[in-house]
Amino acid sequence: MDSQRNLLVIALLFVSFMIWQAWEQDKNPQPQTQQTTQTTTTAAGSAADQGVPASGQGKMITVKTDVLDLTINTRGGDVEQALLPAYPKELGSNEPFQLLETTPQFIYQAQSGLTGRDGPDNPANGPRPLYNVEKDAFVLADGQNELQVPMTYTDAAGNTFTKTFVFKRGDYAVNVNYSVQNAGEKPLEVSTFGQLKQSVNLPPHRDTGSSNFALHTFRGAAYSTPDEKYEKYKFDTIADNENLNVSSKGGWVAMLQQYFATAWIPRNDGTNNFYTANLGNGIVAIGYKAQPVLVQPGQTGAMTSTLWVGPEIQDKMAAVAPHLDLTVDYGWLWFISQPLFKLLKWIHSFVGNWGFSIIIITFIVRGIMYPLTKAQYTSMAKMRMLQPKIQAMRERLGDDKQRQSQEMMALYKAEKVNPLGGCFPLIIQMPIFLALYYMLMGSIELRHAPFALWIHDLSAQDPYYILPILMGVTMFFIQKMSPTTVTDPMQQKIMTFMPVIFTVFFLWFPSGLVLYYIVSNLVTIIQQQLIYRGLEKRGLHSREKKKS
């Protein structure tokens, strides 16, 4: 087997993966875009079974910090809109990215409150509480590190419930503190809850679309418990009423999409119930309900939870809750993507440019792979040296395929040649290639990250297709510089068009990934020449001009 046949192996692996990816998407199709109708009712057998309320109408207040711009409904105190000023919606735009939204076309909210027997958010106790607030707009002032937004509600019995949002400068984690003052003569039983609800279908302004060959990051729900560090839960599964019902101490529930996430983290020592629910009207939910707390007459009870609403910044998320950083979707190759990202981030701390960091990490990866690359070319050279003997054996044995196979294996053993030695290094490199793809598509740090010249976003395709063309050129040179024993006309035609085929594939790939492949090909050319010189000294390679 020679290096050109190895390109066929790469193509087979690559196309096979793309077919598998397409099959996964067909098996779990995304529903067609449709209009979502806001509703104040809850589907039977869903969140109502948890004593969790539906949405309601109230006054909207705004809260602005240096990193968050939220809209909170005083009816229940739900976060109904979240803008992220530090992250533009599109490259070059002044419009901030919108994470949470409440419109006729799309619903994505972070709900929270107090349920339980005496909780004001329990549907059995009437409409959700209409909180009183001091003002309609809260702003984190310059020089201020913390902003508190207190909301109070007093029920007919004179019990006072206070819900306070606590924001900190530069932080996407929002603490929600509850205070329950029991003015009656009987204990009050309340439970905190946190629920994330979202329309399954994406409206046009949120559906960014995808290229024909792009891999897709996960959009859906997830949860974590001490026993199950990270489990995904598809929206389609919830919509089919195959719902989650797990009890756990600690953990969190979340909704994920590319680069961004929302999560509720209960802060208590008791047991929490994690659930999902189909709310009807194309809306699904994931949430938690905490173990009930008793507040004695004349006493004040305190409870708290934390809402994460923002980008998937791994180190910050890990500091908020165990395993919350796992929400960064690196796919099934996360065990390779994670260390690659940590290495890339460490390099970036020195060079300050993600593009140059990718170039450096390419040299590191190819340096580590060099022994395998050398073994690959050595194996291919030995296979070429055996071709005359193999051809003579085939002529001698004619159509006796069984004897041909037996004698060929004996020849490989005698000459100490592994017929698969040329493929193995390539098979190892494919997971690294795909892991880098997932890393580029899942790491918020690389979103809108510029490199140089016309490349302003390493996570997006090259707008002028220059990098894919350069990649095809480097692939062409590698092919022309590689000795070949391919004699089959069909294989020769395939090999001729292989650089063109790969160039077409790479047109829609992230420019950071194409940059990696270009540099990798250039390193391959250099390593190839160094290895060939060593093989020449051993009589395993000749600089004869390659036959066309």
Swiss-Prot record:
Q: Does the keyword Transmembrane helix apply?
A: yes
Q: Where in the cell is it found?
A: Cell inner membrane
What GO CC terms are in its UniProt record? Answer: plasma membrane
Tell me one GO biological process term. Answer: protein transport
Q: Which organism is it from?
A: Salmonella enteritidis PT4 (strain P125109)
Biased composition of type Low complexity is found at 29-42
Family to which this protein belongs: Belongs to the OXA1/ALB3/YidC family. Type 1 subfamily.
Protein name stated in the entry = Membrane protein insertase YidC
Name the gene for this chain.
yidC
> Which residues does the annotated region (Disordered) include?
28-56
Complex and partners: Interacts with the Sec translocase complex via SecD. Specifically interacts with transmembrane segments of nascent integral membrane proteins during membrane integration.
Pfam families membership: 60KD_IMP (PF02096), YidC_periplas (PF14849)
Give the membrane topology. Answer: Multi-pass membrane protein
Please verify whether the record's keywords include Membrane.
yes
Keywords attached to this entry: Cell inner membrane, Cell membrane, Chaperone, Membrane, Protein transport, Transmembrane, Transmembrane helix, Transport
Coarsely, its chief localization is membrane
MF terms per GO, please?
Answer: membrane insertase activity
Question: What HAMAP family is this protein classified in?
Answer: YidC_type1
Which domain of life does the protein's organism represent?
Answer: Bacteria
Q: What does this protein do?
A: Required for the insertion and/or proper folding and/or complex formation of integral membrane proteins into the membrane. Involved in integration of membrane proteins that insert both dependently and independently of the Sec translocase complex, as well as at least some lipoproteins. Aids folding of multispanning membrane proteins.
Q: Where are the transmembrane segments?
A: 6-26, 350-370, 424-444, 458-478, 499-519
